[in-house]
């Protein structure tokens, strides 16, 4: 599903900002994308504090969507993220941190 959404984001990147939320956000640039990610991150935190599972799922989905927009804007692929996760799989977070 992530790849499908990412592919649509890449497609919408070329749409008119008047006709696409993704295109309009990308047209506004990095600061607008990052601001939206910050807003969505805060909403995830509030939903988690409220311990409302349905709200958390909704807000996490919004955050992931906006992270995918950032990835499309920066030309970071799903495969790039997958490869990074594969490198980290099987080692503790502390080991991974030391290797950075």
Regions found by a protein language model. Name each.
Residues 1-60, 64-100:
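Flexible "arm" and connector segments at domain edges
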């Amino acid at each position: 599903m992530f790849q499908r959404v990412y592919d649509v984001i890449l497609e919408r990147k070329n749409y008119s900002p008047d006709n696409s939320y993704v295109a309009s956000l990308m047209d506004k640039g990095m600061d607008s994308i990052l601001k939206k990610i910050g807003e969505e991150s805060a909403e995830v935190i509030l939903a988690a504090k409220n311990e409302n599972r349905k709200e958390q799922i909704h807000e996490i989905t919004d955050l992931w969507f906006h992270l995918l927009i950032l990835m499309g804007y920066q030309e970071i692929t799903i495969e790039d993220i997958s490869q990074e996760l594969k490198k980290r799989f099987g080692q503790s977070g502390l080991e991974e941190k030391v290797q950075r």
